[in-house]
């Protein structure tokens, strides 16, 4: 694959668009689609949006791996998001547009960041990082001016992306899509488990201090910083040392100091360093199918969230879950990374 260096600019733009896109979707859901007295409608919106935005990503990823045209798909996804959020459409039409638009955008961003990575993780971490900030801003900032600003910025950055020359010059022919290697399948299933665990922990690891909307936005900021930092750190010291350094420290922080704001924030940063690592390792399993690889791991975030929601509802013990989850995630990433290193 031959890549123009200006692709770096596009990934930076897509990272900021990630914040805007997730912010637009969160604002539209919480300040429009959820505004009803019917609990049934709220449940339909919740399940419908997350099914479209997350569970459809492997399908869109596979299709885009086959047809390409990332820049066109990016433009279409942003138009769908703007129309679905800024225009007075019916509830379910808006739901469809922002759900599908969100899924398509994430696949495009994932593919571009993987194109650029070239065995580096920093740009994967950069793209995925700001989504958490967008979700928090869209959820907890209630003024309509927030949506207007996000939409205008999305149109500006989207236009810049659209009119930039396509940076991907040559892409090698893709082999047929198949997973017949049992060892590779085992690694993929383990990575899916690791991502599911991260989603469960994101739902269950709540602070023991008062979490005002402002504090929740700051927590999201540190989660974003952790994703970006994970990619940068792994490029310097490797995946193995990154998880051996960050995950045990996050376990200590979450286990003993959830009532301390500053240690909780630092632990959140450390725990989220694993996101670009799992994406990188997954792409090594699905070489040439970057979109499907990215979409597969993204799709299980919703499943993990539901499991975490059930865990909280049943009031099951948190500290046991914390210890098992972090230790298991640590060993999964170490195991899969060792398999990837041996195959190179």
Regions found by a protein language model. Give the residues of each.
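A late C-terminal transmembrane helix in Major Facilitator Superfamily
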Residues: 287-322
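Cytoplasmic membrane-interface "Motif A"-like loop-to-helix N-cap segments
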Residues: 65-79, 235-248
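Helix-loop boundary and gating motifs at the non-cytosolic
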Residues: 2-50, 197-210, 309
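Intracellular juxtamembrane helix-capping segments at the cytosolic ends
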Residues: 102-118, 272-288
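Extracytoplasmic gate region of multi-pass secondary transporters
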Residues: 25-30, 180-227
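C-terminal transmembrane helical hairpin of 12-TM major facilitator-type secondary transporters
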Residues: 240-278
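Central cavity-lining transmembrane alpha-helices of secondary-active solute carriers
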Residues: 43-64, 217-229
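Symmetry-related core transmembrane helices of the 12-TM Major Facilitator Superfamily/SLC fold
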Residues: 146-166, 317-338
